[in-house]
């Protein structure tokens, strides 16, 4: 679990703008790599 969180944080920092825009509007528009993790993480948190 720690590994996933670390990877998610790193990806989010690397593509903050890329993941922030599509994730807010359409989570399906983003790529199935870092965005997918972001959506999954956000869904779990919310």
From Swiss-Prot:
Which cysteine pairs are covalently linked by disulfides here?
Answer: none
Question: Keywords for this entry?
Answer: Antibiotic, Antimicrobial, Bacteriocin, Lantibiotic
A molecular function annotated in GO for this UniProt entry is: signaling receptor binding
Q: How is it modified after translation?
A: Maturation of lantibiotics involves the enzymatic conversion of Thr, and Ser into dehydrated AA and the formation of thioether bonds with cysteine. This is followed by membrane translocation and cleavage of the modified precursor.
Q: Which InterPro entries match?
A: Lantibiotic_typ-A_Bacillales
Q: Which residues are removed as the propeptide when the protein matures?
A: 1-24
Tell me what induces its expression: Induces its own expression in at least strain M25.
Q: Biological process GO terms, please?
A: defense response to bacterium; killing of cells of another organism
Identify the domain of life. Answer: Bacteria
Cellular component terms per the entry's GO annotation = extracellular region
Other comment: A longer form (streptin 2, with three more amino acids at the N-terminus) is probably due to incomplete processing. Other forms also exist, some of which are due to differing levels of dehydration.
Q: What does this protein do?
A: Lanthionine-containing peptide antibiotic (lantibiotic) active on certain Gram-positive bacteria. The bactericidal activity of lantibiotics is based on depolarization of energized bacterial cytoplasmic membranes, initiated by the formation of aqueous transmembrane pores.
Membership in a protein family: Belongs to the type A lantibiotic family.
> Know the name of this protein?
Lantibiotic streptin
Q: What species is this protein from?
A: Streptococcus pyogenes
The record lists the lineage as: Bacteria, Bacillati, Bacillota, Bacilli, Lactobacillales
